[in-house]
Amino acid sequence: MPGITETSQVTGPVLAHVIVTEDPYDASERAFLSTDLYELLFEDYANGSKSGLTLISIQLMGSSLFNEFQTFKVYESEEQLPPNTVNLCNMGNIIDYSSDFTVDSGYVARVDSLVKLDTVIISVLPEVYSLASQSQHQLVDILGGNDQHTVIRQGDYNKDINGKISLCEPTDQGFLESTTKIIVVKENSLNLPLLDQSQDGSLNYEENVKMNLEHSISNYFSLNSLDPENQITTTGVEFSVKCLDSPISVRKTAKSISVAHDSEDESSPKLVEEDISNEDTLLYAFCKTTELAKIGCLSGDIVKMKSGQCQCTTFECNCESCPVQYRYIRIHAFTDPNTYEKGCIYLNPILSFNLNNPKIVKLCPISIPDKRFELQGFHFSKFIPLAKQVTIARVSSPVTLDRTLQTLFLTNLKTYFESGRKVLSKDQLIPIPVDTLLAKSIFSTYEKLGVDDSQFPTVIPEGKPDAIAWFKVTEVSGELADSASQQFIIDPLKTKMMQSGVVSCSPPKNSQHCNWANYLGCGQMFSFPNVSGVTTSTFEYAKTLRKLIKATIDPSRLVNLQTTVLLSSLSRAIGKSLLVHSLALECGVHLVEIDGYEVLNPSSESKTIGTIRGKLDRVVEGCTPLIVFIKHIEALTKKSEQQQKDSLAVKINELIDEYTAKPGVLFVASTNDSDNLSDELRAKFKFEIVLGVPSEQERTLIFKYLIDFDQKTTPKVTEGTRELSFAPRNDLSLSSLSLQSAGLTPRDLISIVENAKTLAVDRVESLAKHHNVSFENMVYSSGGYIKFTPEDVEKSINTARNKFSDSIGAPRIPNVKWEDVGGLDVVKDEILDTIDMPMKHPELFSNGIKKRSGILFYGPPGTGKTLLAKAIATNFALNFFSVKGPELLNMYIGESEANVRKVFQRARDAKPCVVFFDELDSVAPKRGNQGDSEGVMDRIVSQLLAELDGMSGGDGGDGVFVVGATNRPDLLDEALLRPGRFDKMLYLGVSDTHEKQSKIMEALSRKFHLHPSVDLDKVAESCPFTFTGADFYALCSDAMLNAMTRIANTVDEKIKRYNEELPEKSQVSTRWWFDNVATKEDIDVLVTLEDFDKSRKELVPSVSAEELDHYLRVRQNFEGGKEKKVVQENGQTEHFSNGSANNHITFGDEQVVEAIDENGNSIIA
């Protein structure tokens, strides 16, 4: 409509040029924008329709040290700045890098407002702590609060207080106000900037920067003289080789200008444009800027590279250690500052494995007299000839042999060569990423339509690759201008290309040093690292399988091992398939995988075998080395109760023999229940590896992988858009997460992290709504990431436990504290000595020393045995398993013992853990006294004894503590009470003093509202010494009930009197009276002394005095007072009444008794 103009204001990221300056007259941080950029981002401010504070958030590009958006105040636009430019003035963390700063671009976004910070934590050194711990108001003024609008950023170093901003809440960046809580903490090391002062402290900042810059320039020209003799090294410069984790973009102009000479007049140069935008980026290498001077070249130069194994005095040699003398590469300098290592050359993994993964290489500049500064403009074609014809063969693998994937990987191969002028050499491997899901979808769609392969689409979306189709250059021909390099340029318009034949070779090994899978976008798999701990190593099962794979594919082994491995686990989602995939990549082995449920045909065994052969025969015949992996193998052959042979299992055994007869073939199968597998098939596997639930250290490594993987996948920033990405907040502790997630599987840990991200998004949205700020501004305030906090992860873990605890059997930590246990101080000290020592100092038990992990509580009922066991789990942050006797019994033979094994296996999976056997006398009575004909109870006791022996060992059982409780220890099997099992017996009796009784009531009534007149000591003095802890619990509960009844009666009387004053139709209900009339006194329940007296008079003790005497006699029998006889050889008898333990030993016909005195010394007659 006329008179209305539409504006398109840009608020998303804009790529701009960045310069950094320092103002000696004004030390405040600020940003200046060029006029055009200011009008683009702040059009409403530029035309005067809006005024006030303007802010931008900028992420500097090219350096890993600046991977987050930082917010700055924007001053007026500067007309002197070049177009599309940002001037960052006095940015302290950048200026400290001085001459090492080469970042010149970044993404800029508009920020409308920042939130006020609630909390700021500042770390300072101990020597300045007293100075920094000033009043709250002074700290706010120093940091720039109170309407100064100074942006406080987490991670910045503040020179005014010599401290580092360690944490900001609720966002990483914001403004201070008078209500902001500032916390100053002491830190021994702050990782402060290194260029604030010189090492000896004698130079100021400007002199230090000037000296470093002059030294760098003089050092470069001393090594890079224009004298041809000094310009070129004869043997090359050695560098260690490292591989890049992901591709690095290099800024390339479409036309590069170089200098050439006219053939008629060589003295008159002319400019020649050469296109280098489409050259092969796989020949790009990177190093730190300081390393270029050692080589004698500039960033972007073409240099020669050869293996460092050669020790010849000349670079261009012809020795046997260098079959290929050298290769041409283009060297680039990393953007400074960076965290890359000095003395290293960084190659892409594809170039590295095609060079056989050299550890050391030598670089040498190209010798072209009088043209030293022209090499940046040279194309590879100046040194590498054009190939006339090239032949490429498929590498035989499960991917290239799959017809459903053929169309896609051939299309991707064509796209690969059309994207630029590639440089190849003979026997070079070419990786082509493939999205298998996309390829199979296209194939199935067009196959249903009856379309030929030739009519399949030629333009296919890129997709997300999850597999690699390998190709190998078998033949390349052309004029070798430089026979030493054996490199050829492939021009899709001039080079004749042929794809024919299939070759057999192993894929490159994928390792942390050369992670080509992650570089090609297939994702980074968990590597199952074998990290040595105090007592055990992590992922021992991965170490075992890794050894088996390497031994099977070892070409030097003359005997075919015919290796077969069964992977089993008691829980699902442990990571069996991931383990096989990861180790296949790591060891450089082809992998073919089938699912037992997919190939199973219940109606026909022959069809099942036919389907398996159709999927495996061709692959096994053409691929080597190879892992044949069948998951869910229990679907094919389950154990049968009938005593007959499983014909399908026999046929599968024949298949296994046939496949493993070929050298280099490994057969691996996985199952969730190995006991349910057919006996015939299970016996075929030579190795059986059991995967357990991750330990605490293993969970730490898994959490680290999950969180680091998110951080390594840097969000993609483009003009106007930015992908949402997540990152952990600085105070997230991996060790705390792993401790809270005991007993959970790797898939549960993945779910926890994903759910924490969802909770973080919800939290940021609610914060944005509360502060009236847009969601995008909240994200920019946290560095461009959504930061998930420890609270988010803790909520996610609790949600996972509550949702899946029944299905996965994950135990929960009870919420019983020491304050809930009254008295029993001596017992608490004994428990601390038994459990606290192995938990805090496990290294003391690493050499096989037996640890005391069994505790037996015995005594009258109601004395707090179960409560004390739960307090142990809570106090030491241990998981808690409670086992009742009847749940272990099963009518089938052998199942009861299996239940005992499963209990202890779950405890080992969830360690640190407490296994609590309540009423132990019903679970493990004396053997031989039971009336059951099958001897079930005897076998349960025997199994329990064997498991307890495993718990007390120095290996495997660490972190598992067994606690038993019984009222009748005299009924227990005597073998349970020997050292190494329940070797710590603690008697829990009734309180023998009124002081102890008072402590019990204090613990039970600590959440009560007691009347000021209540004195628990007086209440305790009126109680007999026959009251147990359960009796006192009943006493306090009845007292609370009496108080509630009294208050309720009083309220009823008040309501009755209130209604008497009202007409009958207007009388009110109890609910209305509480909502409108009731006072605080009517709601507050105060327990008075009369309530306790009434409860005590009505209470009947649960244990009589006679019964207590009986328990005391039982205690006397177990802890001392019972005389032991020792028969010596001379017939004399000695008596020992010190309560020592005696072990009877028989030598032939003569009985000898071994006695153990109080000091642990052995006395043998």
Swiss-Prot record:
GO molecular function: ATP binding; ATP hydrolysis activity
Phenotype caused by lack of the gene: Leads to a peroxisomal-deficient phenotype with the absence of peroxisomes and the accumulation of aberrant peroxisomal structures resembling 'membranous ghosts'.
Keywords: ATP-binding, Hydrolase, Membrane, Nucleotide-binding, Peroxisome biogenesis
GO biological process: protein import into peroxisome matrix
EC number: 3.6.4.-
Topology versus the membrane: Peripheral membrane protein
Subcellular location as annotated: Membrane
One GO term describing the cellular component: cytosol
Pfam families: AAA, PEX6_4th
Catalyses which reaction(s): ATP + H2O = ADP + phosphate + H(+)
InterPro entries assigned: AAA+_ATPase (IPR003593), AAA_ATPase_domain (IPR050168), ATPase_AAA_core (IPR003959), ATPase_AAA_CS (IPR003960), P-loop_NTPase (IPR027417), PEX6_4th_dom (IPR056995), RecA-like_PEX6_r2 (IPR047533)
Function in brief: Component of the PEX1-PEX6 AAA ATPase complex involved in peroxisome biosynthesis. The complex acts as a protein dislocase complex that mediates the ATP-dependent extraction of the PEX5 receptor from peroxisomal membranes, an essential step for PEX5 recycling. Specifically recognizes PEX5 monoubiquitinated at 'Cys-6', and pulls it out of the peroxisome lumen through the PEX2-PEX10-PEX12 retrotranslocation channel. Extraction by the PEX1-PEX6 AAA ATPase complex is accompanied by unfolding of the TPR repeats and release of bound cargo from PEX5.
Family note: Belongs to the AAA ATPase family.
Subunit structure: Interacts with PEX1; forming the PEX1-PEX6 AAA ATPase complex, which is composed of a heterohexamer formed by a trimer of PEX1-PEX6 dimers.
Protein name: Peroxisomal ATPase PEX6
Organism this protein belongs to: Komagataella pastoris
Upper taxonomic lineage: Eukaryota, Fungi, Dikarya, Ascomycota, Saccharomycotina
Gene symbol of the encoding locus: PEX6
